[in-house]
């Protein structure tokens, strides 16, 4: 394949996919933009531009990965979340738009954005939640925890790339390596998919780290640890926010109640699915 235009390349590439929908076209456009180092506006006004052999080879290599089912974020090496460009690797879960619901909920609950809050993000991965909150709450201090050093390395790189300095990174299994300081807010997007769940997209199963996705006890094992120990790390009147699957809200509400949390509320995502449950330690 040589001396073809961007428009021709798009048409030929789309024809290789069984499902030629808007999403596939978007992914192909993003791959071409990434290789060319341009944005989609450039692409639209230069559809007749011819591509040289070396450029075509680079694009074709990435398209083959897309055909194999590899998620676009891993092919590009990044994903945008809360207006931040986040690097991703095979060691990290790909940030989802649904998780922005959790960030928005936390921010909506904070009346004074200039307050000096202490925030804990458990299972930070790419740092998506921690960095979004740190960027919006410049006077607050965020502690981002992950069990895996490879994930923390990615999160640190993302903090540096986005010029965010009010985040401290700690390698820990949930609360294990934390000191006795308490937090005003705890937030987590932990593994919550049931080990027996068969409704997972094949690309997710094949490419994303299982350790960040699946949990025992109907997907509740890690959530149970986070909630049951939260009172030792949360200030009185502080809030905890847990992202979860859309069928788990009732079980998580029960866990919060058993641990004497109050003001328990379920938050829906943009698809109107239960996505996050929040609770307060102390007052109603």
From Swiss-Prot:
- Pfam families xrefs: MTS, PrmC_N
Q: Does the keyword Coiled coil apply?
A: no
Catalysed reactions listed for this entry: L-glutaminyl-[peptide chain release factor] + S-adenosyl-L-methionine = N(5)-methyl-L-glutaminyl-[peptide chain release factor] + S-adenosyl-L-homocysteine + H(+)
Query: Which amino acids does the record list as binding substrate?
Result: 189-192
Stated EC number for the protein is 2.1.1.297
GO biological process terms held by the UniProt record: methylation
Query: What residues does S-adenosyl-L-methionine bind to?
Result: 123-127, 146, 174, 189
* The entry's keywords: Methyltransferase, S-adenosyl-L-methionine, Transferase
Matching SUPFAM superfamilies, A to Z? S-adenosyl-L-methionine-dependent methyltransferases
Q: Name one GO molecular function term.
A: protein-glutamine N-methyltransferase activity
- Return the broad EC class: transferase
| Alphabetized NCBIfam families for the sequence | hemK_fam, RF_mod_PrmC
The entry's function note states: Methylates the class 1 translation termination release factors RF1/PrfA and RF2/PrfB on the glutamine residue of the universally conserved GGQ motif.
What PANTHER family has UniProt attached to this entry? HEMK METHYLTRANSFERASE, MTRF1L RELEASE FACTOR GLUTAMINE METHYLTRANSFERASE
- Please report which protein family the annotation says this sequence is part of: Belongs to the protein N5-glutamine methyltransferase family. PrmC subfamily.
Q: What is this protein called?
A: Release factor glutamine methyltransferase
Q: What is the lineage of its organism?
A: Bacteria, Pseudomonadati, Pseudomonadota, Gammaproteobacteria, Thiotrichales
Which gene does this sequence derive from? Answer: prmC
């Amino acid at each position: 394949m040589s001396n073809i235009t961007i428009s021709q390349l798009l048409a030929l590439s789309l024809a290789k996919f069984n499902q030629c929908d808007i999403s596939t076209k978007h992914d192909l456009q993003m791959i071409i933009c990434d290789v060319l180092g341009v944005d989609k506006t450039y692409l639209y006004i230069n559809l007749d531009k011819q591509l040289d052999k070396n450029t075509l080879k680079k694009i074709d290599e990435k398209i083959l990965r897309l055909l194999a089912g590899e998620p676009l974020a891993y092919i590009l090496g990044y994903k945008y979340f809360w207006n931040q460009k986040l690097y991703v690797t095979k060691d990290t879960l790909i940030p989802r738009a649904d998780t922005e619901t959790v960030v928005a909920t936390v921010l909506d609950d904070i009346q004074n954005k200039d307050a000096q809050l202490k925030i804990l993000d458990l299972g930070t991965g790419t740092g998506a939640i921690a960095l979004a909150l740190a960027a919006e709450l410049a006077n607050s201090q965020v502690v981002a925890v992950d069990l895996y050093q490879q994930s923390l390395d990615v999160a640190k790189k993302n903090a540096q790339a986005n010029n965010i300095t009010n985040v401290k990174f700690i390698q820990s299994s949930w609360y294990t390596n934390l000191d006795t300081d308490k937090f005003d807010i705890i937030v987590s997007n932990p593994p919550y998919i049931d080990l027996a769940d068969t409704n997972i997209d094949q690309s997710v199963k094949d490419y994303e780290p299982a350790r960040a996705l699946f949990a025992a006890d109907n997907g509740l094992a890690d959530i149970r640890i986070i909630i049951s120990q939260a009172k030792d790390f949360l200030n009185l009147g502080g809030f905890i926010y847990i992202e979860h699957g859309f069928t788990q809200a009732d079980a998580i509400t029960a866990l919060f109640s058993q641990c004497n949390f109050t003001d328990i509320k379920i938050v829906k995502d943009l698809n109107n699915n239960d996505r996050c449950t929040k609770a307060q330690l102390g007052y109603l």
